């Protein structure tokens, strides 16, 4: 064996550049960090975004350190997703990978650093959105789970469940026209967009229901009055998370 070959074999391995993300294949609960992660999930029209906004305002009034993030909002990926939708080029797998790239970017730049920085992170939809929607489009559930294994596990995952007809009616009554992918038209379920949307949302609802026990969802009734539902949500947050960890600013009112 010559000297050059021996040096190559004995040379120490160079570690790749470090990332703020946990290593792939090793999911790390958010409780491993000083911060806390609260997530809302549910079908379109379930009321999840409204409730998270109200919770966010309540915590902001209290002066707590928090950060809000929402699904499919990374500026790095958003334009590519938009172009793919406009040209109707997205297959279920391509769509799923774009969403995963979007989430990975936000996870590394926002979610993980803020959890490490002792912040309360509020997420309007999380990896369970991909598990439900992408599985409804035919992506293998196990493949999806592996794709997002780097994601920290939420401290609380609220699942706002509303009957299919109620949720669909809320969306249809507030939208002049459903978008192509939103309605699930790429799946060939129906030529009618409203009917395709109903069928697609039914598939998504079924996928969400499968995750209730395995992913420790806190199920809330999306049909009860907004104020009553918000009270339930706040009570669960206060009883599950020590909000004093997030140091209200001096002079700010503490949430009741």
Feature map (PLM): residue ranges:
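Hydrophobic "anchor" residues on beta-strands that sit immediately upstream
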Residues: 37-40, 120, 157
